Amino acid sequence: GYSSAASDVYKRQFINYPKEITFDNKISGALIITASHNPKQYNGLKMTLNKASLDEAQIKEVKELTLNQTNNKSSNYRFGLCRKFDIVSTYIEKISQSFTNIGKNIKIVVDSANATGGLVAPKLYRELGCEVVELYSEPDGNFPNHHPNPSDESTLDDIKKAVVQNNADFGIAFDGDSDRIGVIDSKGNYLTGDKLLLIYALDIVEDLVK
């Protein structure tokens, strides 16, 4: 793999996509094995270079390089190193420093759909001061509770009930690799992407007019 191409490899068993993108380290690129919100029988690759996703032309270039590679190596060829590492603590520390105590007096329900969100989100939100109710935080590629696609409102029945039953302020449901969310308000209503965009925009405008 990468190490045979003289690259040093840092290996993490489970990782969520935003965490990989924002990790502050001298890492040239990343390869994530993920099918995102697709059914469990599918898989795929997400590739980044210098913390940016590869565009179509770059992906084609990677394909050509892969198809045309050779195994001819000189006798003094250096294989790269392969190291395991855990960046969760570093990621949480970085985010919590940027958003100090924003979760104070806030109660949320987090539905990780037995995917990568459960490894980070509950701990991160608690670090930010939130009271957290967890749903399906244990990773399981069979997705035994529901499909990890928060864009499909039918997958949000459990979190809707949990938000109301726990008198939470809102709920957040993640997809398979945690780069998309579904949001439930305090009354158990699903907030569409358009409504979320409006909320974000109003917050930005409010900051601009201060």
Indicate residue ranges for each PLM-predicted region.
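Gly/Ser/Thr-enriched, mixed-charge loops and adjacent short helices
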Residues: 43-166
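Gly/Ser/Thr-rich loops at beta-strand to alpha-helix junctions
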Residues: 38-39, 114-118, 178-179
